[in-house]
Amino acid sequence: EMCIRDSREIICPTEYGDIIPSDITLSAGVKEFYEKGRESLLKEALSDIGDEYDYIIIDTPPALNILTINAYVASDYIIVPMSSEILSLVGLTQLKETVDSVRLSLNPQIRILGILLTKFNSRTRLANEVKEMAESVALQMDTALFDNKIRSSVSVSEMPAHGMSIFKYAPRSKPAEDYLCFVREVIERIG
């Protein structure tokens, strides 16, 4: 909870924007989030700094837990990254139910902005089948796939080990190009 209260003190400026890094200790403190009314802790913490930024991006793990719920309560939009694999489709139904529940009780304006396919290889039949199925699921979720997909690349797998973004580690790679196009598409959709 200390980190939540002192958000301004832990902001780290970078050349791409300010970040508040997470670490393994965040999950250790998750029990504090289970008290009544704790779904809005992140929203409250960000309210102090929200006016200073055009966009605040909250990166969450794929798990649907109280930390993720906090992110949903604090957000206007959700972007769903999904690797181009069949098993990735399974969690979308549960995600929709969770978002609907948050919308009903905690954040009526939240909206799924779209589904972003990652590790995409348009030359494989599987990736194209997953894309078709994801398009169908997206319609059921009242959203759409992003036109841009993040192509698969060794550089995307390697960069976390080097502690760098794709723009630093492999700035001329296809995924770096894809992410730039994706950011433009997000800004367009938000308007």
Which sequence ranges carry the predicted segments?
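P-loop NTP-binding core
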Residues: 1-191
